Amino acid sequence: MKKVIVGISGGVDSSVSAYLLKLRGYDVMGVFMQNWDPYINKESNNDAIKSKLDTCEAEYDYQIASKVCQRLGIKLERINFIKEYWDMVFEPFLDEYKKGLTPNPDILCNKYIKFGAFHKYCFENFDCDYIATGHYADVRFNQANNIYELLEAKDIEKDQTYFLCSLNQSQLSKSIFPLADLTKKEVREIANKIGLDNWDKKDSTGICFIGERNFKNFLHNYIDKKPGKIIDIDTSKEVGTHEGIHFYTIGQRKGLNLGGNSSRYFVCKKDISNNILYVTSNESKLKNLSSVVATCSYFNWIGYVPNNNKVEIRIRHSKNKINGHFKILKDNVVQFEFDSPEVISPGQYIVAYQKGVCLGGGPIKDNINE
């Protein structure tokens, strides 16, 4: 009997994943990861903890995970990757933010923690054959090319391949995604049917393993406020004050706090060296902020580089894919050209697809306006 370790988070997805694997005849064991501690990590503005009567969120989730595993009749272990998460995910995330980039900590977390440190620990300590998670994705072995492929899930709205774009062959070869052929609605129905208390638990949002926070207040724990001018680029007049240029992205409309004028303004330029945020109310300038070409550095090809350079491109998890093509400039530096202009930001990830297969992804280094 093959042994599978399931990363149990306390959420409905990982819980149902464990149940399905038991149903398929695997020897299943759950492992709960704690990767963030607001006290160790000196998080003072933690509204989420206050709302739970000072009970750490990890403890709250662990209690749920324990009840799930008791219900399913499987063993649950608990491990701690707080230091690894800080060193490999959170510090790089902060460094990118300070540079005015738009980093994606969820992608780093999957690469270095969930499918990195977690995989390594489980294989070294639990004598297992596979690791399973509650991600909405799929993996298959392509015999023709002798590689493992990462596939989109049945539930396209919940598909998480965007966040898995940095995985490699070794990680995929030992991974199982039990929810590949299920919708979120079906997952909740299964959980309810088998009597799991978390069947209607709210989906987790926010930064990976940190949870829901007021994002700006949260970052103020680690990045000093650096107020500066907000200037209307069309009139050169100062229209407000920002709390730190790194909190804003090109094209952003919400959160500018410009009084009655807020709704008509959007960010059009960031002068990082002089700490000035430029805004405009001229909608025609939005087109000038859009790009048809973007270059990715450190692009990760999950399997192989396809001969056909026409691809579907996702520039953020929540956005529909667009058509385009790619050109390899050197090593892992890849240039993408979009069929239509898109507003993008350096640091943001581009993820490429062909016929439902996630080919890989990488952070945007720069972009060329149309």
From Swiss-Prot:
InterPro entries: MnmA-like, MnmA-like_C, MnmA-like_central, MnmA-like_central_sf, Rossmann-like_a/b/a_fold. Disulfide bonds join C109-C208. The record marks H135, Q348 as: Interaction with tRNA. Its EC number is 2.8.1.13. ATP binds at G7, I8, S9, G10, G11, V12, D13, S14, M33, G134. SUPFAM superfamilies: Adenine nucleotide alpha hydrolases-like. The active site is at C109 (nucleophile), C208 (cysteine persulfide intermediate). Catalyzes the 2-thiolation of uridine at the wobble position (U34) of tRNA, leading to the formation of s(2)U34. Belongs to the MnmA/TRMU family. This is tRNA-specific 2-thiouridylase MnmA. It comes from Malacoplasma penetrans (strain HF-2). The gene is mnmA.
